[in-house]
Amino acid sequence: KNKIALLGGQPIQDSPLKPYNTISNVEIKKANEVLNTGQLSGYIAAPGENFLGGKWTKKLEEDFCRKFEIKYSVTVNSATSALHAALIAAGVGEDDEVITSPYTMAASATTAVMCGAKPIFVDIETDYFCLDVEKVKKAISPKTKAIMAVNIFGQAANLKKLRKIADEKNIILIEDNAQAPGAKFHNIYTGTIGHMGIFSLNRHKTIQTGEGGVIVTNSQCLANRCRLVRNHGEAVIPETNEFNGHEDIIGYNYRLTELQSAIAIPQLRRLEKLNKQRQELASFLFEEISKFN
């Protein structure tokens, strides 16, 4: 019998497959609109309306709120930045503990370390590969400050039970929803059941702008803290654009550009279509692979 390519046989495909392209002419048109203005970022780290970014960034945040039926959204330059900002907003710091899944991308754990905290790994359940709720209960200690539930491969953790546990223990529940945009748990969008949820705009995610991330929450306080983290921790009260007189949080440059925001807006509008395409590709692979013994 012929050897498979992995073992030295002749490959069926002798050149790399073309990357899957989700950028349409609409995104190209929007990107050109921004390029023609010459204003590729709308941020200023000072009091004023531009502390919260430019018009495209604000429009993307409005669209995220509308799409996922949530009060506040905060764009940042990556989902890793979003996880870090959310943990800071939750008050996670030195010697705290953050419960999370070991079955995830590294940032779900390393962002806790970036805050000076310790990631506590809790095993996953076997049906959806998400945090096992009963094991989460056993892992909670007086040092537990947050639970980071990872919704992986489009599947949701048992978010209602995790939220109930978090509320009872006065712990913040953060959803790492990078791999499940548009998924629902009991008819509620994943990413919106926890105190905060994280979305990714990385190039291989469903909605992509090359790099980027979004934090969503129903808490004005948490949203404002994330905004401060995003823009150097400048002491600005966003609602009134008045100088606050003191800094109460250390911030970074986690700002998303106008160009990225303009590309993300039409991508978000096509979320259902993009998810359906991925589901069709997955179904095809499952069907073909099942033919092998």
Language-model region placement:
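Conserved beta-strand->loop/alpha-helix structural units within folded catalytic cores of enzymes
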Residues: E69, A85, S101, I207-E211
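Short amphipathic alpha-helical/adjacent loop interface patches that line ligand
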Residues: T57, E61, V133, A282
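Active-site region of PLP-dependent enzymes
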Residues: A180-H186, I193-N293
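Buried hydrophobic packing segments
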Residues: A82-L87, S108, A112, G213, ...
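Generic structural signal for small/hydrophobic residues in well-ordered secondary structure
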Residues: K30-A31, F64, A82, V98, ...
